[in-house]
Amino acid sequence: MALPYHIFLFTVLLPSFTLTAPPPCRCMTSSSPYQEFLWRMQRPGNIDAPSYRSLSKGTPTFTAHTHMPRNCYHSATLCMHANTHYWTGKMINPSCPGGLGVTVCWTYFTQTGMSDGGGVQDQAREKHVKEVISQLTRVHGTSSPYKGLDLSKLHETLRTHTRLVSLFNTTLTGLHEVSAQNPTNCWICLPLNFRPYVSIPVPEQWNNFSTEINTTSVLVGPLVSNLEITHTSNLTCVKFSNTTYTTNSQCIRWVTPPTQIVCLPSGIFFVCGTSAYRCLNGSSESMCFLSFLVPPMTIYTEQDLYSYVISKPRNKRVPILPFVIGAGVLGALGTGIGGITTSTQFYYKLSQELNGDMERVADSLVTLQDQLNSLAAVVLQNRRALDLLTAERGGTCLFLGEECCYYVNQSGIVTEKVKEIRDRIQRRAEELRNTGPWGLLSQWMPWILPFLGPLAAIILLLLFGPCIFNLLVNFVSSRIEAVKLQMEPKMQSKTKIYRRPLDRPASPRSDVNDIKGTPPEEISAAQPLLRPNSAGSS
């Protein structure tokens, strides 16, 4: 898993191209300054302090950088090492790898997700993509005589590559080793778009560091950037002598290389920040730890995959019944009829337009079939002429050495289908002509009629209710006035008060007829009653 999966996918799916053989690279050193970490498991659960193996003096080591900015060189030339193309050039900037005036080598392409700012690495990648596209166009665009259907190339294209299968198998093996459930039925999925690689720190109990690999080629610089780090604790960290940090809560152990330049065995990487390195030269300013790199795979069980792919049905919530009834009545009385009328007119117009479109489709099919019939007639005439010209050599097919092709006229099926379409169009046109917008509205009358009675009652009540109310009020007022007029004389007679007895009118039964009194003086009940003086009475 040292090689990112979409790097070898790019190499596999795109055919390779050939370049002229460049001169060998001159980026060799007589003695390797790099050393390898070597761990030995002494007892389970404990890892001894790392030991280092330096290459013997005189062993040539090739050193190349994975990234070279555009402002580090004026010009670059191609060179070759171990059947691989590299760029070489002289550094013009002291801050560049190697220093000012030093000739260094770097990879032909930039690493995944990186750019050199429009330098030779980016230009080489663009050139490679253009050549591959032109090659694919040339291979698949050349027309060849028809010799039957050949799906062999399609099968080769669709076949999963061996290295991709190996990647899946390695992932599954690792899953079985680290998973306690040991899943047997699962789905391993790769993303179609680019996603960052996943960094998994080297676990505390790990016993596979004893693999020794001779380092004859060293790649300095980041191999992958923008990593996704899964864990930030229990890390095995690397500390160089020029670094200032000594403790970190995320690290459970520290290892200090004896030199500033060190490499890791294949399959293990230094992760510094969000970039992965195979070799470090001690110039990293951030904390580095040991990690594995895995592609951004997603593992699903059968149940998880089904729940992820197949969407669950959405259950409708049951609204409150009074709210439904109230909303239905208000909608029917307020805006129901207008909405139904608008929808009916809209669908009627849509049906007419659809009918016209179907008619045009039928006409297009008839026109296309006529063109095919005329083309077939021309081809048959040409075929007969070629058969006459090549009759001495056995006819056209024998002359070309190909299979004979015959034309089967199936225009009758197309004509029959067009006739059925036109019959349906005619029926729909008659239905629309007989129905009309008000005919479509009649289909909604069974739904509207139950609301017409309450609606008419409410309208009549609003129209005639005020008049009836005014009549009732006037009638009651007139009766009250009549009763008041009848009761007023009686009330006045009961409220008269006389000053003297002689002031009272004579009773019909009285025998005194010659007594003349003064007219009675009416005194209102509100005035005080005057009593006669005892001295003045006679």
Curated annotation (Swiss-Prot):
Residues 496-538 are annotated as: Disordered. It comes from the Eukaryota. Residues 1-20 form the signal peptide. Residues 465-538 are cytoplasmic. The record marks R317, V318 as: Cleavage. CDD domains: HTLV-1-like_HR1-HR2. Changing R317T: Complete loss of cleavage between SU and TM. Loss of fusiogenic function. A motif (CXXC) lies at residues 186-189. A motif (CX6CC) lies at residues 397-406. Expressed at higher level in placental syncytiotrophoblast. Expressed at intermediate level in testis. Seems also to be found at low level in adrenal tissue, bone marrow, breast, colon, kidney, ovary, prostate, skin, spleen, thymus, thyroid, brain and trachea. Both mRNA and protein levels are significantly increased in the brain of individuals with multiple sclerosis, particularly in astrocytes and microglia. Specific enzymatic cleavages in vivo yield mature proteins. Envelope glycoproteins are synthesized as an inactive precursor that is heavily N-glycosylated and processed likely by furin in the Golgi to yield the mature SU and TM proteins. The cleavage site between SU and TM requires the minimal sequence [KR]-X-[KR]-R. The intracytoplasmic tail cleavage by the viral protease that is required for the fusiogenic activity of some retroviruses envelope proteins seems to have been lost during evolution. The CXXC motif is highly conserved across a broad range of retroviral envelope proteins. It is thought to participate in the formation of a labile disulfide bond possibly with the CX6CC motif present in the transmembrane protein. Isomerization of the intersubunit disulfide bond to an SU intrachain disulfide bond is thought to occur upon receptor recognition in order to allow membrane fusion. Residues 21-443 are extracellular. GO terms for cellular component: plasma membrane. Residues 320-340 are annotated as: Fusion peptide. The mature envelope protein (Env) consists of a trimer of SU-TM heterodimers attached probably by a labile interchain disulfide bond. Interacts with the C-type lectin CD209/DC-SIGN. The cytoplasmic region is essential for the fusiogenic function. The 17 amino acids long immunosuppressive region is present in many retroviral envelope proteins. Synthetic peptides derived from this relatively conserved sequence inhibit immune function in vitro and in vivo. This is Syncytin-1. It comes from Homo sapiens.
